[in-house]
Regions:
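N-terminal strand-loop-strand
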Residues: 1-17, 45, 49
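Active-site donor-binding loop signature of nucleotide-sugar glycosyltransferases
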Residues: 4, 20, 72, 92, ...
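A generic structural signal for secondary-structure junctions
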Residues: 7, 112-113
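Short strand->helix junction
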Residues: 8-9, 22-24
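Unchanged
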Residues: 23-46, 56-111, 133-140
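Catalytic phosphate/metal-binding cores of nucleic-acid and nucleotide-processing enzymes, i.e., regions
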Residues: 52
């Protein structure tokens, strides 16, 4: 997990999030995953799986975005220093206690449950989660 503490004017400031980033021109989701994992962690992923797509919406000035959610169970290399925050391997119990976006707990729970591929919509009003829809069914 990445503890976002190094970027200025960061909407994720002091939250724990997964690694990731924006697509570059002509990149597929898995190409973006491999590039971002290498850039942010120094690790080369050797085994991964796409687990779902999360749609983030907001009632504020941010337009929202789509996130392809992957898990990896194989990698090579050593963790390096990240310029966006502090990288740490964390246990599930410890992760549950860390500050993160409210909606992140929903998809983290789905990952821990090894749920099949899912579509999740998360709508925020500022920092507050106001709607969550999982596979077309409103859950919050």
């Amino acid at each position: 997990m990445l503890h976002r503490v190094k970027k200025k004017n960061d909407v994720n400031q002091d939250k724990w999030i997964g690694i990731g980033g924006k697509f570059e021109a002509d990149e597929t989701p898995d190409e973006c995953l491999l590039r971002e994992a290498k850039e942010e962690t120094g690790l080369t992923l050797t085994s991964w799986r796409c687990r779902g797509v999360v749609t983030f919406l907001t009632n504020g000035p941010w337009d929202g975005e789509y996130m392809y959610l992957f898990t990896a169970d194989g990698f090579e290399g050593e963790l390096k220093e990240c310029d966006e925050g502090d990288l740490r391997w964390v246990s599930r119990d410890f992760l549950d206690q860390l500050p993160k976006w409210e909606g992140d707990q929903i998809f983290l729970d789905l990952l821990w449950q090894d749920a099949p591929f899912f579509l999740l919509k998360l709508r925020y009003d500022g920092d507050k989660l106001v709607e969550a829809v999982l596979n077309g069914e409103k859950i919050r």
